[in-house]
């Protein structure tokens, strides 16, 4: 798929088919997350790839955004391992995690899969479910799977600011 097609096709899917994602596709998606850039290549990020039914069921309790995805990629970051901007002390961990999560979503779209970025969840409850998550701050839960037949972009999906509203060009 052409890169611009990937960008234009991706939407927030809120209805997933009851179909398992092939392991080869999962591996390619995770590789995209692994090679995503991070500030000073510190890589203060971790991905939990959740597909086992018991853990997926437990995760339902941490958010109201449950749409039947067979795979959830939880992205977390460790601020203590991240680059910090010296001018104002801004920690780059969350930005790094957001970059990784975006790579994961675009890679999934490239594989013919749908995604939903979920940011509304209880991180303390999630911490109790995911192994080896102490010290991590959770940034996103990316729902991944084949879209259900009835799935379609929301009515506001195509609403975008104009280039003039979004961009200032300095020549």
PLM feature spans:
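Alpha-helix/helix-capping structural signal
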Residues: 54, 121-124
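C-terminal helix-cap and adjacent tail motif
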Residues: 3-20, 25, 140-171
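Short, electropositive alpha-helical surface patch
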Residues: 125-139
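Short beta-strand segments at enzyme active-site cores
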Residues: 115-119
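Glycine/small-residue-rich phosphate/adenosyl-binding loop
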Residues: 25-31, 35-100
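Short hydrophobic alpha-helices that are characteristic scaffold elements of the AMP-binding
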Residues: 106-109
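Structured binding elements
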Residues: 112
């Amino acid at each position: 798929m052409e890169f611009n097609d990937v960008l234009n096709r991706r939407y927030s899917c809120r209805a997933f088919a009851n179909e398992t994602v092939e392991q080869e596709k999962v591996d390619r998606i995770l590789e995209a997350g692994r090679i995503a850039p991070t500030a000073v290549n510190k890589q203060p990020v971790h991905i939990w790839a959740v597909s086992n039914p018991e853990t997926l069921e437990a995760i339902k309790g941490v958010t109201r955004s449950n749409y039947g995805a067979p795979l959830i990629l939880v992205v977390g970051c460790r601020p203590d391992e991240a680059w910090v901007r010296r001018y104002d002390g801004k920690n780059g961990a969350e930005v790094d995690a957001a970059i990784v999560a975006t790579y994961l979503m675009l890679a999934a779209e490239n594989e013919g899969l749908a995604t939903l970025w979920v940011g509304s969840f209880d991180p303390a409850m999630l911490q109790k479910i995911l192994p080896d998550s102490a010290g991590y701050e959770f940034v996103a839960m990316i729902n991944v799977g084949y879209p259900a037949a009835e799935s379609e972009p929301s009515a506001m999906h195509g609403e975008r600011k104009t280039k003039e509203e979004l961009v200032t060009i300095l020549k």
